[in-house]
């Protein structure tokens, strides 16, 4: 990585010039709350496997001590604050991935070190027999809509906003936050409403992963109060299928590219509520998406049974690493296609760190336990794949330049709709189930400046037309 302190808050701070040059305006950090990386420690194939991702929280009000660069006590708070301050100085917001759906105390056989010992029945959802509901897939489920737990979550988020100045939160398995004490989904969950209306949180971003491991899927229907954005899982799934050439997905792809109006086109929520993504920490990297047809999680020690099977990927003709120049060229073309579509879609784009230089996890789509070369960013690929990096940088700048894509300009002076879908012929928007071709045009008027050659100054408007 070329930094003095890799794997720490200081290491990220050292990479701020890189992020700024790329054009990044916000970073979403995977869990930074204190967690025990030795939970589930195993030895598999000569590797020590740990909790690398940090989704099993131990302390909700403290940064993880393992992310400090120096060994002094209590340095983690100072170093994290310094990182956030410097990111802000460079125009980059900070979003924290927070986990309030479960804790590290596990199921009935798990340890007792916090909420189990304070009041097990208040803090956790329990069956009538006293067992733990497991809507999180991690052994227990926090009883989020109990008044006591609501207050803890509110105080925790206020703490990170007031003392650390974070700009927002992404809520892991957020649908759990809308369940009643018996697991029933609530129409108007008090916790979600309180978060949306809290005066301390009024200016921060609230982003939901709008599903959970219990089968509740709320993309487009998450209780929002005009405040909540969502990771758009339908964008990921349907665009992946369309981009690799599958039938049946062109009409859905058109909706996703144009801001998912079927999901976010209501009176209050708009397309900015859609966090558009093709990759994240869960699943394949973008390079692996076009290098593997199947997951390869053998190194995790579960006989390749863990991780998602529905990846909607395509290996471009060969599984895994290839020395064939034609296959590698096709993979890079597919990556460019994906990048261009993502950054020319209405909504808020998000991509996984390292996608901009073809980082690989060697087909592992669930690298939660791999604190090694499988998960680490291979910065040597940056120079090797400079072409892809420059394409990402260009597309980010292109998106910033063209406000028509973002829907942040005046109506087109030529009478074009702000966004239109086309098939083989202009203005033919009859996208059929057999379609594999799709065109989208964004149109609007930009203020170009003042005409100094006339007697009175007037603003000139120029057309901003973008064809995808």
Give the role of each language-model region.
Residues 435-439:
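Short hydrophobic/aromatic beta-strand or adjacent loop that forms the aromatic wall/cage
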Residues 1-166, 173-200, 216, 263:
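Substrate-binding/active-site clefts of carbohydrate-active enzymes
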Residues 165, 178-182, 186-353, 357, ...:
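Conserved alpha/beta catalytic core and glycan-binding cleft of carbohydrate-active enzymes
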Residues 383-417:
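Catalytic cores of secreted or luminal carbohydrate-active enzymes
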Residues 2, 66, 139-142, 175-176, ...:
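Glycine- and acidic
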Residues 43-60, 361-393:
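Extended hydrophobic/aromatic segments used for targeting, binding, or gating
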Residues 29, 281, 395:
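A residue-level signal for conserved active-site and pocket-lining positions in enzyme catalytic cores
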Residues 13-21, 84, 157-161, 192-196, ...:
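Non-transmembrane alpha-helical segments in soluble domains
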């Amino acid at each position: 990585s070329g930094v003095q302190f890799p794997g720490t808050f200081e290491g990220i701070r050292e990479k701020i010039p890189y992020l700024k040059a790329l054009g990044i305006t916000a970073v979403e950090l995977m869990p930074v709350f204190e967690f025990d990386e030795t939970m589930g420690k195993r030895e598999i194939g000569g590797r020590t496997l740990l909790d690398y991702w940090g989704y099993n929280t131990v302390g909700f009000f403290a940064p993880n001590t393992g992310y400090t660069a120096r060994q002094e006590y209590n340095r983690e708070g100072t170093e994290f604050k310094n990182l956030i301050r410097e990111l802000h100085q460079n125009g980059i917001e900070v979003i924290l991935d927070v986990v309030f759906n479960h804790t590290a105390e596990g199921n009935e056989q798990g340890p007792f070190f916090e909420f189990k010992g304070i009041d097990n029945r208040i803090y956790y959802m329990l069956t009538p027999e006293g067992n733990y509901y497991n809507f999180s897939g991690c052994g227990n489920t926090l009883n989020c809509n109990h008044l006591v737990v609501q207050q803890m979550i509110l105080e925790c988020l206020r703490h990170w906003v007031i003392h650390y100045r974070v700009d927002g939160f992404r809520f892991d398995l957020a649908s759990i936050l809308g369940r009643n004490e018996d697991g029933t989904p609530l129409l108007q969950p008090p916790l979600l409403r309180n978060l949306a209306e809290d005066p301390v949180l009024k200016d921060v971003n609230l982003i939901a992963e709008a599903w959970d491991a219990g089968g509740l899927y709320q993309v487009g229907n998450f209780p929002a109060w005009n405040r909540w954005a969502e990771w758009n899982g339908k964008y990921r799934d349907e665009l992946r299928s369309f981009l690799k050439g599958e039938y049946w997905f062109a009409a859905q792809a058109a909706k996703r590219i144009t801001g998912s109006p079927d999901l976010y086109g209501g009176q209050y929520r708009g397309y900015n509520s859609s966090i558009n993504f093709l990759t994240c920490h869960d699943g394949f990297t973008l390079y692996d998406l076009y290098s593997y047809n199947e997951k390869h999680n053998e190194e995790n020690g579960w006989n390749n049974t863990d991780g998602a099977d529905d990846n909607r990927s395509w290996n471009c003709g060969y599984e895994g690493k290839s020395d064939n120049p034609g296959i590698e060229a096709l993979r890079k073309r597919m990556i460019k296609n994906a990048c261009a579509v993502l950054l020319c879609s209405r909504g808020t784009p998000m991509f996984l760190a390292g996608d901009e230089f073809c980082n690989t996890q060697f087909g592992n789509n669930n690298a939660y336990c791999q604190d090694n070369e499988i998960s680490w960013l291979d910065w040597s690929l940056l120079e090797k794949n400079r072409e892809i990096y420059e394409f990402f940088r260009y597309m980010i700048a292109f998106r910033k330049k063209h406000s028509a894509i973002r829907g942040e300009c005046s109506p087109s002076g030529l009478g074009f709709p702000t966004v239109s879908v086309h098939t083989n012929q202009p203005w033919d928007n009859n996208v059929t189930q057999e379609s594999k071709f799709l065109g989208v045009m964004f149109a609007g008027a930009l203020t170009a400046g003042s005409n100094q050659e006339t007697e009175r100054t007037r603003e000139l408007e120029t057309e901003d037309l973008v064809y995808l």
